């Protein structure tokens, strides 16, 4: 339980006492009562809306309830002061012992500090990246990979049982384009001059694949019609691309639990089973769709089609699952894939898509709702575009890929840790500027450096203390008593609450934002110590005070390390 949850329980207990004293009526609904940090830190350590929430159902003025609550809460030893503000908000200021207790908890729990049980072991499938197996991952895939991986780690820390999954789109026409492109590189490996036409993949990454194919089959396919080699090369080319993609993911430290092939859905009865499930629920019918306004989607045709009643589950229009010629639409295997997820017993599904898939969200949610009977929620997180630049110059091309900057290019330029952290400095659905020069600056304007610098500074102080024969000792925590020090401890106390909020909203960027704020508070206290010597973490003439202050900064380092672990970033001990 977080400290904020503990204080909320204290507020609820005080309300129960007021009910028992007949100050408040019984049967009041408490769910909307909150305890959280005030918007203005000068107002106190925590604020509660209890009086505002209870006023109407109790038939009382908010301030009257607030004053009665304040009198009860003032008796709690953990609370120094209770102030009634505005129409009836309560601002609480906690005792120094509470904040020193937070420091002690962080030291005791170490890597476990901030871990939560709110997930209660629920099984969550997080599908992310899922790029077509046609080439190396590009900078847009990088954002989805980082976001999805950090989200999976966040949910794990919050007590969920997480499966990380990659859906291999190896059943569509784009793989045929890959095969034809590989064939051209294969001919090139045999010494032929080839021309890459529009619609093929010209990147240098296929040169080695063409050579590998030559080594495998010799000249068996040279100058043969594609009916002789298209199917034969398809599996080979897909495997080669997935090996490349796995290597790209490894550069970022991303490891998947499951790679699921779209092709495995065809010819196995899985698509038919999913559609039959919907048919059995009365959600499949034969009919016509009105032509859509604007651009005509690929799955629309002016003929009778097999349609899914997705409008009964929140979609704007019903969706085709089978064309008039009897072939499946693109949507059908996606339905089957999510039917498989539901059948595997997951309690919640999360899909991480690029922003260009925004139009797919409602139909996918409708499908999962129908397939699970509304029991399995699907949250679709869209990652917006990344604009890669070097100063004023936008970086668009990569010789390796032929048309785009790759994940490997980005990691080579700035490193995996910088890449991962910076990809989380904006909410996933906001566009992101990624300046490869800016992210290497050593300044407060570079969040990843600023957070890492805080951790390195702390480790430097701890090494100095160790050389002097001193170490953190919670028995001396009374030395942490200055308001600036206690404010830093209060920031540490926010971390467990932050984890729960971020996990409930599937928002790992909140962790990055919090770490920057924590680092800023730490650096601010460090700078204060330059002028006010009693705030310095290393007190040459007072070993006991030093050991107490070392506890404070050790707790900060623990939180930074734990938070960076969620983001997939390695904390540095020196810079």
Curated annotation (Swiss-Prot):
Enzyme class, spelled out: ligase
Keyword Coiled coil in annotation: no
Pfam families, sorted: Arg_tRNA_synt_N, DALR_1, tRNA-synt_1d
Keyword Aminoacyl-tRNA synthetase tagged: yes
Example of a GO MF term: arginine-tRNA ligase activity
InterPro entries from the UniProt entry: aa-tRNA-synth_I_CS, Arg-tRNA-ligase, Arg-tRNA-synth_N, Arg-tRNA-synth_N_sf, ArgRS_core, DALR_anticod-bd, Rossmann-like_a/b/a_fold, tRNAsynth_Ia_anticodon-bd
Gene Ontology CC, one term: cytoplasm
Cellular compartments annotated: Cytoplasm
Catalyzed chemical reaction(s): tRNA(Arg) + L-arginine + ATP = L-arginyl-tRNA(Arg) + AMP + diphosphate
Keywords attached to this entry: Aminoacyl-tRNA synthetase, ATP-binding, Cytoplasm, Ligase, Nucleotide-binding, Protein biosynthesis
GO annotation (BP), single: arginyl-tRNA aminoacylation
SUPFAM superfamilies to which the protein is assigned, alphabetical: Anticodon-binding domain of a subclass of class I aminoacyl-tRNA synthetases (SSF47323), Arginyl-tRNA synthetase (ArgRS), N-terminal 'additional' domain (SSF55190), Nucleotidylyl transferase (SSF52374)
Ranges spanned by the short sequence motif 'HIGH' region, renumbered to the chain: 131-141
Domain of life: Bacteria
EC numbers, comma separated: 6.1.1.19
Subunit structure: Monomer.
HAMAP family: Arg_tRNA_synth
Family stated for the protein in its record: Belongs to the class-I aminoacyl-tRNA synthetase family.
Full protein name: Arginine--tRNA ligase
């Amino acid at each position: 339980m977080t400290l904020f949850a503990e204080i909320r329980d204290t507020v609820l207990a005080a309300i129960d006492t007021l009910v028992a004293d007949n100050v408040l009526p019984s049967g009041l609904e408490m769910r909307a009562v909150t305890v959280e940090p005030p918007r203005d830190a000068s107002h106190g350590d925590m604020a509660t809306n209890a009086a505002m929430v209870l006023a109407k159902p109790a038939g009382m003025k908010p301030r009257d309830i607030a004053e009665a609550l304040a009198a009860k809460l003032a008796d709690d030893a953990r609370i120094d002061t209770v102030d009634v503000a505005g129409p009836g908000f309560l601002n609480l200021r906690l005792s120094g012992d509470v904040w020193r207790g937070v420091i002690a908890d962080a030291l005791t729990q170490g890597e476990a500090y901030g871990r939560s049980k709110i997930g209660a072991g629920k099984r969550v499938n997080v599908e992310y990246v899922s790029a077509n197996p046609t080439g190396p991952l590009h900078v847009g895939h990088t954002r989805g990979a980082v976001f999805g991986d950090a989200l999976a780690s966040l949910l794990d820390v919050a007590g969920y049982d997480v499966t990380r999954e990659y859906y291999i789109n190896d059943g569509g026409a784009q793989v045929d384009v890959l095969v034809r492109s590989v064939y051209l590189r294969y001919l090139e490996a045999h010494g032929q001059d080839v021309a890459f036409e529009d619609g093929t993949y010209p990147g240098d990454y296929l040169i080695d694949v063409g050579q590998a194919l030559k080594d495998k089959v010799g000249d068996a396919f040279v100058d043969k019609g594609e009916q002789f080699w298209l199917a034969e090369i398809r599996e080979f080319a897909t495997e080669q691309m997935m090996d490349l993609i796995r290597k790209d993911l490894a550069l970022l430290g991303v490891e998947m639990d499951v790679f699921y092939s779209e092709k495995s859905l065809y010819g196995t009865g899985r698509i038919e089973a999913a559609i039959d499930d919907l048919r059995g629920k009365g959600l499949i019918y034969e009919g016509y769709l009105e032509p859509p306004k604007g651009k005509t989607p690929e799955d629309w045709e002016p003929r009778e089609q097999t349609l899914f009643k997705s409008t009964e589950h929140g979609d704007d229009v019903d969706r085709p699952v089978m064309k008039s010629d009897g072939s499946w639409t693109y949507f059908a295997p996606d339905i089957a894939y999510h039917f498989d997820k539901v059948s595997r017993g997951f309690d919640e599904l999360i899909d991480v898509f690029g922003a260009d898939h925004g139009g797919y969200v409602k139909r996918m949610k409708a499908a999962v709702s129908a397939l699970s009977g509304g029991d399995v929620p699907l949250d679709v997180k869209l990652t917006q575009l990344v604009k890669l630049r070097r100063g004023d110059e936008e970086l668009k091309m990569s010789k390796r890929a032929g048309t785009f900057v790759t994940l490997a290019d980005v990691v080579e330029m700035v490193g995996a840790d910088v890449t991962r952290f910076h990809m989380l400095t904006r909410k996933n659905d906001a566009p992101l500027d990624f300046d490869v020069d800016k992210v290497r600056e050593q300044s407060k304007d570079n969040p990843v450096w600023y957070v890492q610098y805080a951790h390195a500074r702390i480790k430097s102080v701890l090494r100095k203390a160790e050389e002097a024969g001193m170490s953190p000792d919670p028995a001396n925590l009374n030395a942490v008593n200055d308001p600036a020090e206690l404010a830093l401890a209060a920031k540490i106390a926010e971390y467990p609450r932050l984890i729960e909020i971020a996990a409930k909203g599937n928002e790992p960027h909140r962790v990055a934002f919090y770490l920057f704020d924590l680092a800023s508070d730490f650096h601010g206290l460090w700078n204060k110590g330059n002028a006010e010597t009693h705030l310095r973490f290393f007190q040459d003439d007072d070993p006991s005070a030093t050991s107490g202050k070392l506890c404070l900064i050790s707790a900060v380092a623990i939180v930074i390390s734990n938070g960076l672990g969620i983001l997939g970033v390695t904390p540095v001990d020196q810079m």
